Amino acid sequence: MKTIYPFMGLALCSVTAQAQEKPNFLIIQCDHLTQRVVGAYGQTQGCTLPIDEVASIGVIFSNAYVGCPLSQPSRAALWSGMMPHQTNVRSNSSEPINPRIPENVPTLGSLFSENGYEAVHFGKTHDMGSLRGFKHKEPVAKPFTDPEFPVNNDSFLDVGTCEDAVAYLSNPPEEPFICIADFQNPHNICGFVGANEGVHTDRPISGTLPELPANFNVEDWSNIPKPVQYICCSHRRMTQASHWNEENYRHYIAAFQHYTKMVSKQVDSVLNALYSTPAGKNTTVI
């Protein structure tokens, strides 16, 4: 197994080595994941044990940022290596508000596929054409129920994404590959907010509710940046939670940890599939 790099960013690279010397690459993405629940960054909730194990034998970054704090602009930046002001993908809207990445712009997928790699992508796209060069397999949603927390299509699609990635990595191609397992969760937390809009009583859960963070109560709003002061008016999820009480927010944190544990188990399945074949010994995990 090669050095492993779990982090929220990726630099484009060109590949010039001979086929037999080329390493494989596995990129695992978890939409909405924050280091505040990742054990490798000092958290103690036990939400990300497989990720923590990877980090323990690899490299982590403590000062890395996404290209934009919105899904589609961030993804377009990640796969193209260009910032949102260069791609003009500035929001989560589709065309014509946001243009697709031009065909003449190199992408991660095009660079690898043009240099002898099989480039495959499983899971969430939301990329405005920046995944060009990857063979994409759309996941099939697999509905299920959860006794404690609401689940929606985010979680249903992740079941299909996990199955597709596991099947591929369990029987990898002979040529070098770059594979992306692109999970939705813990993005299901957005659906949790919508399902608990306004004043409400939360569904009882097993275990102890997490404590609120130290910065939950703001004593002096004048010291808070303007964008943060007005974020309640800029996204529907903030409006939906605007009348929550402290216990509601503790349930929110518990739900976020729950969705993170769900996707962490799927990450574990993907890694086990990778290491079940000799290809895993020549694969860099990101």
PLM region spans:
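Short beta-strand segments
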Residues: 27-30, 63-65, 123, 178-185, ...
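Active-site-proximal N-terminal segment of extracellular/periplasmic enzymes that hydrolyze or transfer
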Residues: 20-59
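Active-site-proximal cap/lid insertion segments
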Residues: 32-45, 171-175, 183-286
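Alpha-helical packing segments of well-folded alpha/beta enzyme cores
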Residues: 29, 50, 104, 108, ...
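Catalytic-site neighborhoods of secreted/periplasmic enzymes
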Residues: 77-179, 183-205
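Pocket-flanking alpha-helical
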Residues: 70-78
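Sec-dependent signal peptide recognition
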Residues: 2-9
